[in-house]
Amino acid sequence: MKILPGLTSTESDRIPAFVEALRRSDVRAIALFPTVLDPAERNELYRDLAAIPGLTIPHVHLRTDCTPDEMRFVAEQFGTELFNIHPRKSRHPFGEVPSDYASRVYVENVEIAPEDDELAALAGICPDYSHLESARLMGSTEYAATVERQLGSYPIGCCHVAGIRAGEPNVWNGGPDHHNFRSLADFDYMARYVDVLPARWISLELENPLDEQLEAARYLERLLGDRRRWTGRRGLSA
């Protein structure tokens, strides 16, 4: 299992610095979250990323305006293997998934949980653990129970990991989940989910600079590795 730093574009003014740091580093695998970028802006970003020799993007979060041609492009240019989308009843549904990509597209839990039949029709679930943990802490018991059940029932191909900053409400729903972390302890909640992780990649959905994300990745590797050494069951940890 590899932890991928994320190029997350909610704060798009941070993108140039991230790309330059990536270019200067030996990191050659990232996840991409083009959250606020329109097609023209994404094309410009793709050109910048394509100029980095050997760069791969195993996991891409698809915006609602991503086309089949764009999916094919990133798969061919960057070796993208897995995609995620929002549920069809969410505020930003993706729409119809091209049939030739259905086995590579996973549905994320966002402000609502995915429906079982859409998980069954596509590749499975892309858990956003910070959304789930935020819902659990805020008392959204039905949502949390649904997603936790789905984690034990459907394939988990990719995921989102962000920070939980207790006592610091975010701007979108007042929860403690944030795309910026302030302390490595903001990831301690992930110990709860060690037995429901993807097999290959954990994607950091963070706005922090690359060097800070790499520090977070090392912390998570230790945290999750230590936790896995003494638990062998599939399911949520206590």
Model-found features: residue ranges?
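A structural motif corresponding to the C-terminal end of an alpha-helix
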Residues: 25, 52, 77-78, 101, ...
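N-terminal pre-domain/capping segments
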Residues: 1-62, 234-238
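Flexible loop residues that form catalytic
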Residues: 35, 88, 110, 130, ...
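Gly/Pro-rich active-site loop or hairpin
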Residues: 133-200
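Short, acidic/polar
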Residues: 10-23, 42, 65-76, 115, ...
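Active-site acidic/histidine proton-transfer and metal-coordination neighborhood
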Residues: 46-127, 134, 185-189, 212-222, ...
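A short, acidic, flexible beta-alpha connecting loop/helix-capping segment that sits on the rim
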Residues: 36, 90, 203-213
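Hydrophobic faces of well-ordered beta-strands that scaffold small-molecule active sites
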Residues: 1-9, 28-32, 56-62, 81-85, ...
